[in-house]
Regions:
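Short S/T/G/P-rich N-terminal loop/turn motif that feeds into the first structured element of a domain
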Residues: 1-90
């Protein structure tokens, strides 16, 4: 099990959130273990995914359906940062 944090800039935060909520079919292909948590601050977004296989999840980030969903959502792909949360304090 792994948590993955994805951060990016979008063209319009409100439009991005509305569009994101329509991608249930895409998210089902990610092998997620729970709901997608996210935050929006202006034109910056952050999403947290819990997945069974971080490497498989990372591959899905470049699949055509994900790239197209990001395009529709107004994600500025050049700003996307992905972090696998693999360390803890406690």
């Amino acid at each position: 099990m792994a948590k993955v944090l994805v951060m990016a800039q979008v063209q319009d935060g409100m439009q991005w959130e509305t569009s994101l909520r329509t991608h249930g079919d895409v998210f089902k292909t990610y092998g997620l273990l729970g709901p997608v948590q996210f935050a929006v601050s202006g034109n910056e977004v952050a999403l947290c995914f819990e997945t069974a296989d971080a490497q498989a999840f990372l591959k899905t980030m470049n699949e055509p359906q994900t790239v197209e969903a990001m395009k529709v959502d107004g994600v500025k792909r050049e700003t996307v940062k992905v972090y696998v949360l693999d360390k803890s304090v406690f």
